[in-house]
Amino acid sequence: MRKLSFIMILLFCATFTYAQKGKVTQAISYLTSGKLDQAKKLIDEAMGHESCVAWDKAYFTKGQIYQALYESPVADYKKLDSEAVEKAWEAYQKVIELDVKKKYPKKLAIQYRNLAIDFTNRAAELYNAKEFKKALASFKRVLEIKSSPILTANGEVSI
C-alpha cells in the first residue's frame, strides 16, 4: 500500500510539473496567434511555479510576450501592463543568467535590437509627457542594451 501511495504521489508531481511547462508551450501558441491576453495569463501562471523558475525557455517566452504587449497597436493589450517593456528586459536578463548551454545569444540579439527601439520610443513618450526621470531611465536602458555583450559580441555597436 505504501509503495502504491508513493508511486501515485510521484506520478502526480511529475504530471503537475509537466502541466506547468505545457502552459509555457501553450503561451507560445497564443503569442504566435496574436492572443496576447491569453499568452500573458498563461505565462504568468507558469512563472509562478517552481518548475519554470529556473527554465530559460520560460523566461525567453515571458520576454517575448511582454515585449509584444508593449509593441501591440491594440490599446487593450497595452493596458494589460504599463511596465511591459521593462518586464521584457528583466526576463531577457534572466535568460542570460540561466542559459548555461548558450542556446539563446542569437535569439536574444534579435530581441535586443527591437527592445532598444522600444525603450527609445518609451523614453520619447515619457519625455513628451514631462516625466523626465522615467524618460532618462529609459534612455539609459537603451545605452545599456547597445553596450550589452549580446550585441557587441558580433562586433555590432550601433542599432
Predicted regions and their residues:
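Generic alpha-helix initiation/capping and coil-helix boundary signal
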Residues: 7-12, 39, 81, 135
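Short coil/linker segments at helix-helix boundaries
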Residues: 64-158
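Start-of-domain marker
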Residues: 20-80
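Bacterial Sec-dependent N-terminal signal peptides
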Residues: 1-29
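Alpha-helix initiation/capping motif
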Residues: 21, 55, 153-159
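Residues that line or immediately flank small-molecule/substrate-binding pockets and catalytic motifs
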Residues: 8, 60, 146
